[in-house]
Amino acid sequence: SRQAVRICRLFGDNLTQRVTTSVGPEQEYFIVDRETYLKRKDLIFTGRTLFGAMPPKGQEMEDHYFGAIKERVSNYMKDLDIELWKLGIPAKTEHNEAAPAQHELAPIYNTTNVATDENMLVMNVMKKVALRHGLVCLLHEKPFAGVNGSGKHNNWSLTTDTGHNLLEPGR
């Protein structure tokens, strides 16, 4: 904070006394049917496939990313929202991602240390809620060859105690 305040002074801001970081992690994940998952020892033991054929269909965006969320996954997402709300973690968006069976959850940003703790809770809750729906949530960064993996985009900001976001684009 001290060095950030020094930079603020160089730009003529004499009011700022403290700068804090905040982050909004976007958690990507794959959802698979539990019965299918249980047939794959590689998925069970490593969280990813170690052998197998390439998928018959790629990740054409028009039919997955922009497609409707499947009812079973939608029900999972609704239940997940409820469980996260109970913990005080509201989600801003949930949607399909580029690869088949891939999705994303983006909680509301928070101060960095709190957002990090919340993301650990989010990942645990995602797995537990999936099991209740007969699904398995895969958080491995690359569980399937030949399609996009799951990343975690982190949207950062530096905010002054006067409420100014230092990373907001200027005019």
Task: Place the predicted regions along the sequence by residue.
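Glycine-rich, acidic/polar active-site loops that bind/position phosphate-bearing ligands
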Residues: S1-L139, F144-R171
